[in-house]
Amino acid sequence: MDKFAAETGECKMKWDVKTIRLAFIGSGFMAQAMLRGLVRSGTVPPEHMGVVNPVDPETCARLSREYGVLAAEPEWLRQADVIFFAVKPQTFPEACQMYGKYFTADKLYLTIMAGVSCAAVEAATGNAAVVRFMPNLALSVQKSATAYCLGKHAGEEEAALAQALFSPLGVVARLPEAQLSAVTALSGSGPAYFYLLCEAMIESAAADGMNRETARALTVQTLEGAAALIAFSGESPTEMRRRITSKKGTTEAGVAALEEAGFSRAVQAGYLAARRRSDELGKQ
């Protein structure tokens, strides 16, 4: 199925990120974040992307206006080279009922449905090539942490497309599918843990009399700066924490109080709960 450039005779990759026709099934937050990131990064021409969601035509129309993508009818799925499942895992069977007649084995299928295995998507698409992803909402600002795995019918050309699509949108890691539930709990759900910490810090400062907007600005910059230091220093979070925790100082007092209140245990409990839920979704 390799494509050839008639004018040069050069053999092109099976999946060329600049020429594929990419159809999104679903127009929720993750689909919107993905579209925004792909358009802003210039990864895929907007006119090569379409969004299919007859249940929410208003959102599709807005995405078309904002990003120049096609608010597509289901029939457009026939023309697509790559179909991207961006629906909730619970609605995957319904999506297959609605659009299954457009699924053919010569297409590539991408999925971000938590807990839905490559095998399940393969079974619904005639044993086509499938790549399963777990990104997060930071796709929209090209700061996502994304992991992916290949289905049994996908090979290195599909892996190359996965890298080409997601590398401009943040950090990308290829992993065995067995680790995708862990990724879901860590980086897929992780932004919500971060936001919860932000909320708690802002509320604490506001309750202490600080202007809420000032508290927000200081909190966001503090956490952004701390993350940047870890990324660029190469040191472990433990080493960095110990370095700034002076004996009998304010940081030591604060960290000790957090741990006494069960901070680390609470984070681990949240991670494990999200991981279990990912596994449960895959069984529904």
Predicted regions and their residues:
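NAD(P)+-binding Rossmann beta1-loop-alpha1 motif at the extreme N-terminus of oxidoreductases
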Residues: 3, 9-72, 144, 206-207
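NAD(P)-dependent Rossmann-like dehydrogenase/reductase catalytic/cofactor-binding core
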Residues: 3, 14, 18, 220-284
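Rossmann-like NAD(P)(H) cofactor-binding subdomain of soluble oxidoreductases
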Residues: 34, 66-67, 71-148
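Short acidic capping loops at alpha-helix termini that bridge into adjacent secondary structure
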Residues: 45-49, 105-107, 213
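Small-residue helix-packing motif on alpha-helices
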Residues: 49, 60, 92, 211-218, ...
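Internal alpha-helical scaffold of NAD(P)-dependent oxidoreductase catalytic cores
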Residues: 50, 120-129, 145-182, 195-232
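Short pre-catalytic strand/loop immediately N-terminal to key active-site residues, enriched for Gly-Thr
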Residues: 130, 180-185, 237-242
